[in-house]
UniProtKB/Swiss-Prot annotation:
The gene is sucC. Pathway: Carbohydrate metabolism; tricarboxylic acid cycle; succinate from succinyl-CoA (ligase route): step 1/1. It comes from the Bacteria. ATP binds at K46, G53, R54, G55, E109, A112, E117. Coiled coil: none annotated. The keyword Magnesium applies. It comes from Agrobacterium fabrum (strain C58 / ATCC 33970) (Agrobacterium tumefaciens (strain C58)). GO terms for cellular component: cytosol; succinate-CoA ligase complex. Mg(2+) binds at N209, D223. Heterotetramer of two alpha and two beta subunits. Binds 1 Mg(2+) ion per subunit. It is an enzyme of class 6 (ligase). This is Succinate--CoA ligase [ADP-forming] subunit beta. Belongs to the succinate/malate CoA ligase beta subunit family. Keywords: ATP-binding, Ligase, Magnesium, Metal-binding, Nucleotide-binding, Tricarboxylic acid cycle.
Length: 397
């Protein structure tokens, strides 16, 4: 689960991290009052969407020459003007895709005198089984581009979970970021704070980009991104309360209600599979034959008829879907249950696109019999390769 920048900063502020004063608004009419609560005279008006690259993004409604989703303002009047431009309009960034995201919230923040921009994130480094700091002196920009073009500028410092962030760890991180003086002193408090927040809130990612050194030498969290482990949210009602469903795909929200592992993608072949590994293999073979998957959908090992039907309806609700491939290897999952769910869903919502079903495993013959006798336009496949060829051929006509 992701949250907005202003929410992430409020959380970090609660742990004692240095963040600027700011006020979130939902309406243009709130902009003036929000700005008056801040010291000024420099303000920053920030679009709040669950995507990066906001500063370089463009608003669909404002034309190619308009400013992006993060704007400086040197007066309260400018704050109001920027707010009027941004709220309610669609921001397109490198991470949103061409559709963009509607800006429903802004964060009005006090400006800062920036001397240096750095990058700092925490994540689980699975190669060593520890939480690690990933840092770079090249902050405020696309860290993926830095990693690709100048990987030597990316430094990873893994933290021993039994010891936490030690003085040696702080020294190593500070050296990698070329911190000295006041900034190095601030680092002694900040890096343990970030680590503590990451662990206590069960985060999957904590990204500060940029972490700035101000003209006075002190550190400040200028932007913050947080992603939380959805499996741990039952422990964090305070974090769950921060969820903004308007930022999420409606199909993914519906899938979460049925405990389905569903991720919307950009292709045109809907996939329903049991098991994450089989789901990835299914998507790979679709790409091998020249098409793109429209989703990742894992119904799991113990799904019942109703859950299967729900998954099918979610897939067919995507207007991009031109064909559907159901690929089931039944172990705990029974093929007849899959067949019953698919048949029930098709009878309820109709079948407007080609449907190919490959079943193998427990009760496979019964599952195939149910499909064959359903009277529905369902194409059976003998194996995964056959299934992929048939769904691609059906779409190509």
């Amino acid at each position: 689960m992701n949250i907005h920048e202003y929410q992430a900063k409020a959380l970090l502020k609660g742990y004692g991290a240095p963040v600027a004063e700011g006020v979130a608004i939902l309406k243009v009419e709130e902009a003036e009052a929000a700005a008056k609560q801040l010291p000024g005279p420099l303000y920053v008006v920030k679009s709040q969407i669950h995507a990066g690259g906001r500063g370089k993004g463009k608003f669909k409604e404002l034309g190619p020459d308009a400013k992006g989703g993060v704007r400086l303002a040197k007066s309260i009047e400018e704050v109001v003007s920027h707010s009027r431009d941004m709220l309610g309009n669609t921001l397109v960034t490198a991470q949103t895709g061409d559709a963009g995201k509607q800006v429903n919230r802004l964060y009005i923040e006090d400006g800062a005198d920036i001397a240096r921009e750095l990058y700092c994130s925490l994540l689980v480094d699975r190669s060593v089984g520890q939480v690690a700091f990933v840092v770079s002196t090249e902050g405020g920009m696309d860290i993926e581009a830095v990693a690709h073009d100048t990987p030597e500028k990316i430094h990873t410092i893994a933290i021993n979970p039994e010891k936490g962030v030690s003085d040696a760890d702080v020294a190593a991180i500070s050296k990698a970021l070329e911190l000295d003086g006041v900034a190095a002193e601030d680092a002694k408090a900040l890096f343990p704070i970030l680590y503590k927040a990451f662990n206590e809130k069960d985060m999957a990612l904590l990204e500060v980009n940029p972490l700035i050194v101000m003209e006075n030498g002190h550190l400040r969290v200028l932007d913050a991104k947080m992603s939380f482990d959805g499996n741990a949210l039952f422990r964090h009602e305070d974090v769950k309360a921060l969820r903004d469903e308007t930022e999420e795909d409606a199909k993914e929200i519906e899938a979460s209600k049925w405990d389905l592992a569903y991720v919307a993608l950009d292709g045109n072949i809907g996939c329903m599979v049991n098991g994450a590994g089989l789901a990835m293999a299914t998507m790979d073979i679709i790409k091998l034959y020249g098409k793109e998957p429209a989703n990742f959908c894992d119904v799991g090992g113990g799904a019942g008829k109703e859950k299967v039907a729900a998954a099918f309806k979610i897939i067919t609700a995507d207007p991009k879907v031109e064909g559907i491939l159901v690929n089931i290897f039944g172990g705990i999952m029974k093929c007849d249950v899959i067949a019953e769910g698919v048949i029930a869903a098709v009878k309820e919502v109709g079948l407007q696109v080609p449907l190919v079903v490959r079943l193998e495993g427990t009760n496979v013959e019964l599952g195939k019999k149910l499909l064959n006798e359903s009277g529905l336009a369902i194409t059976a496949a003998d194996d995964l390769d056959d299934a992929a060829k048939k769904i691609v051929a059906a779409i190509n006509g």
